[in-house]
Amino acid sequence: MKNLNCFIFIYLVVPLLGRAQSTFKIEWKSWSELEQSIKEEPKPVFIFFHAKWCSYCKKIEREIFTKSEVIAKLNSKYYAVEMDVEETDTITFEGRKLTNKQALTKRNGVHEIPLLLASRERFPFSLPATIILTKDFTLKKRSFEYYTSKQLLDFLK
């Protein structure tokens, strides 16, 4: 009987637990949602810039942004925004229209928003780029490398 109960638990309950965890995700916001949310309840902002061709970005999305402690921290303490740097849509934020002007002249052109927030003097634009802004949109921290979940949690302190 013990073996039967164990069998039932393993084959019926454990898969359900896995499915329940997979629905616990980072609550990513669009730029317009961010603008509205900040007005209603000011919080710091976590921004993750990525591209389809960036292997370290994909690894962060797959291995770090799926960790429950990372998800819980981001969802409770920050507004999270993720953006493909090659986005071609015009984004209106705080009354300013921002576009990907490079898309007209360059392959893999970068949108104005990541260029404004993640460019560095004397360094080429690089990914992954992670930005923390205060609730007043002042730059607090930036990271331009792959990180583990522990490193990200330390970065978020």
What are these regions (language model features)?
Residues 52-59, 128-131:
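C-type cytochrome heme c attachment motif
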Residues 41-55:
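Short active-site neighborhood of thiol/selenol oxidoreductases, capturing the structured segment around
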Residues 135-157:
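Thiol-/selenol-based redox modules, centered on thioredoxin-like
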Residues 27-45, 74, 114:
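A short beta-strand-turn-helix
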